[in-house]
């Protein structure tokens, strides 16, 4: 059983944390070795950048993937002998045949190879070598996914063979490339630029063996940290694609509050705007930018009510690709601004024949004018963040090889960042490697089936293999045939408790119900949401830990147990932070109300929270769970901070419950900040909590290295 419950008063103390150096795309000269048309940069003992340019036009600008190359120079040696260049670190040996192109057809004696030791086995890599053991990453969307669609996943940064390669010149799945950033020296947004030598090779070899956490940590050193979302993001989101009126949404909020259901985000889907093309209020075009006053007669008043009286945050859904129609409220202002900015471009590049201003977000003038005239008015009345939905081309129309998804994420996220008011984030799909810098991910329109639910724990944890730690799924499923399934919805919500974002959602079909109080098992669903809010102190601390380490909150078992075969086989379970193992029920109990599940518990003791049993690990156990029970386990010695019952996260409680799990000595560094401050890197505090068999101690930490 849990050994102790301790109430700890939360001190309102914010102590500055130490901030590391700013990103610098220029590597230290001491890390660079040139040989003819080749350039090598030794970034860490396990990571080497490899470039080839027949024009000797090497890139020092930031790319879509890599924004920082100025790392401490590791120890390495370089030597030329017998016609080869050798670079040797503590972990790798690179051999390059002088004067040759690095890619060759001779697999026995390649022009370039890197050798490393993986648990006593010598592994040899050469350009073009395939890896069937890559542990995968993620994909752009789960739109129309039903069940296991792992074949959609891109390769990740981790592999059981011990190495992986970031190839900056390899096309992404959407057909785009990793392009370059042109630095804005005036403090504005860095903008897309083409490479100097489009035929150059540019790749990063990562030979970390099975030290997966170090691989991800070093990746985020060169590719940027995983930003920490605002605290309220980790609460419950209510969402439904439905032609709601303002009064409908007020009624839903009041129903939620009257039934003591915690909530922090109300999502307003696309019917908030009128038909952009016709100006009509009785039907909706995908693209639109002006409020439908027939449905929302007082948008500013409504959002003020959400913020001030209901303690909620909100977002609006966008489908931007059709541009800005002439009947939009601020069309004239946008047209006049762009006409002046586009003065050196033919008039027909600004609009279509019907006068619609073309969508051209890859143009910086368009970005600045569009945000000023179209989006800023909505932000000024309180829209907190943007949900950028689909309906644009995969590749930008006016910039070669530019992926629209990645670029929209970059622009929307950094626009919020430049405002410097609150913590920036964007709600959109995955745009490819480097997209971890722009959370949060909207996984799209999956099917409402148990098989789709069963895939999501694996999918979400595996995304951490590319640093993408914040997928938000349509809890309950998006597309649904047939009647509502109370068991499926409950199990999906229970999984959502232990996923990065808890957001219920579905498409506009009238028969699909996402209001949990409409179900007979409402109290079980609400109890799951209560559990989510109780765990917020732990979740938020783990989110900060992800920012600091590059390791996602939801992560596969093999990060912690890389040499255990079970860690790779039991894909439906995962670590939720450092101390909680979760194995959600993702199949129907066929009316028995009890589900059996095989769970691999690693070495040590594990506290099964739902039953109160302390179980010996090191084996696979078969456990039974009623519908209200969620299979999750505390590691022995774990200290889990919990909030008391609460309805929202805008005002946090003054007390904290600490649950101590018996067994080994435990420690937890409890994290706090203002919740939505843009300067969380510096304005924060950590409290170290430790336990042994005799005592519990609390220590405020004065600084934290980031």
Segments and roles (model prediction):
Residues 79-230, 240, 253-258, 624-644:
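Catalytic and substrate-binding clefts that recognize carbohydrates or anionic sugar/phosphate headgroups
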Residues 435, 440, 465-466, 470-473, ...:
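Catalytic core of carbohydrate-active enzymes
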Residues 699-706:
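Conserved small/polar residues in nucleotide/adenosyl-binding loops
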Residues 9-16:
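Bacterial N-terminal signal peptides
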Residues 146, 240-262, 266-269, 273, ...:
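A conserved hydrophobic secondary-structure block that centers on an alpha-helix together
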Residues 262-525, 560-562, 570:
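Aromatic- and carboxylate-enriched substrate-binding clefts and catalytic-loop regions
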Residues 45-82:
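A low-complexity, Ser/Thr/Gly/Pro-enriched, surface-exposed linker/loop concept
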């Amino acid at each position: 059983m849990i050994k102790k419950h301790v109430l700890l008063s939360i001190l309102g103390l914010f102590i500055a944390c130490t901030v590391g150096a700013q990103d610098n795309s220029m590597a230290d000269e001491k890390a660079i070795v040139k040989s003819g048309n080749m350039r090598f940069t030794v970034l860490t003992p396990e990571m080497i950048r490899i470039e080839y340019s027949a024009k000797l036009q090497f890139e020092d600008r930031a790319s879509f993937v890599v924004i920082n190359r100025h790392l401490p120079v590791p120890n390495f040696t370089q030597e030329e002998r017998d016609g080869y260049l050798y670079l040797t670190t503590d972990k790798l040996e690179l051999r390059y045949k002088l004067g040759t192109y690095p890619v060759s057809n001779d697999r026995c004696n390649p022009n370039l190879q890197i050798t490393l030791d993986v648990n006593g086995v010598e592994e040899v890599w050469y350009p073009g070598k395939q890896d069937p053991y890559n542990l995968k990453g993620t994909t752009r969307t789960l739109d129309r996914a039903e069940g296991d669609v792992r074949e959609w996943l891109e390769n990740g940064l981790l592999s059981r063979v011990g190495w992986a390669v970031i190839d900056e010149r390899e096309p992404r799945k959407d057909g785009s490339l990793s392009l370059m950033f042109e630095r804005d020296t005036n403090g504005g947004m860095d903008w897309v630029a083409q490479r100097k030598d489009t035929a150059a090779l540019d790749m990063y070899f990562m030979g970390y063996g099975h030290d997966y956490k170090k691989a991800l940590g070093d990746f985020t050193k060169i590719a940027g940290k995983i930003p920490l979302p605002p605290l309220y993001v980790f609460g419950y989101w209510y969402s439904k694609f439905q032609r709601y009126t303002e009064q409908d949404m007020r009624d839903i909020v009041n129903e939620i509050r009257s039934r003591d259901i915690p909530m922090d985000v109300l999502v307003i889907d696309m019917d908030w705007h009128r038909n952009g093309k016709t100006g009509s209020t009785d039907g909706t075009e995908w693209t639109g930018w002006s409020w439908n006053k027939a449905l929302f007669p007082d948008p500013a008043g409504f959002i003020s009510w959400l913020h001030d009286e209901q303690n909620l945050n909100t977002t609006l859904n966008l489908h931007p690709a059709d541009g800005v129609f002439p009947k939009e409220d601020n069309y004239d202002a946008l047209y006049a601004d762009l006409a002046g900015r586009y003065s050196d471009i033919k008039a027909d590049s600004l609009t279509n024949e019907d006068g619609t201003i073309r969508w051209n977000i890859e143009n910086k003038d368009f970005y600045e004018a569009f945000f000023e005239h179209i989006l800023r008015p909505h932000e000024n009345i309180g829209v907190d963040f943007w949900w950028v939905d689909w309906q644009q081309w995969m590749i930008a129309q006016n910039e070669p090889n530019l992926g629209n998804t990645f670029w929209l994420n970059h622009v929307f996220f950094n626009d919020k960042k430049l405002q410097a008011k609150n913590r920036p984030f964007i709600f959109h799909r995955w745009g490819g490697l480097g997209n971890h810098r722009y959370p949060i991910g909207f996984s799209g329109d999956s099917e409402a089936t148990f098989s789709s639910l069963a895939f999501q724990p694996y999918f979400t944890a595996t995304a951490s293999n590319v640093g993408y730690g914040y997928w938000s799924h349509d809890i309950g499923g998006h597309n649904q045939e047939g009647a509502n399934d109370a068991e499926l919805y409950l199990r999906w919500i229970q999984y959502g408790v232990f996923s990065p974002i808890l957001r219920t959602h579905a498409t506009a079909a009238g028969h699909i119900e996402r209001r949990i109080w409409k179900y007979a098992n409402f109290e079980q669903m609400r109890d799951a949401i209560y559990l989510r809010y109780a765990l917020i102190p732990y979740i938020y601390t783990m989110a900060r830990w992800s920012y600091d380490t590059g390791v996602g909150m939801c992560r596969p078992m093999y990060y912690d147990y890389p040499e255990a075969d079970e860690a790779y086989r039991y894909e439906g379970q995962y670590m939720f932070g450092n101390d909680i193992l979760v194995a959600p029920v993702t199949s129907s109990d066929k009316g028995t109300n009890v589900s059996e599940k095989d769970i691999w518990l690693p070495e040590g003791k594990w506290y099964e929270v739902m039953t109160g049993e302390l179980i010996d690990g090191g084996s696979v156990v078969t456990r039974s769970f009623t519908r209200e029970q969620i299979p999750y386990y505390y590691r022995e010695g774990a200290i889990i901070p919990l909030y008391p019952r609460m309805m929202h996260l805008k005002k946090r409680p003054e007390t904290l419950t600490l649950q101590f799990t018996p067994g080994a000595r435990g420690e937890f560094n409890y994290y706090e900040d203002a919740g939505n401050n843009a300067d969380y890197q510096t304005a924060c505090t950590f409290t170290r909590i430790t336990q042994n068999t005799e005592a519990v101690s609390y220590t405020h930490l004065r600084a934290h290295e980031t």
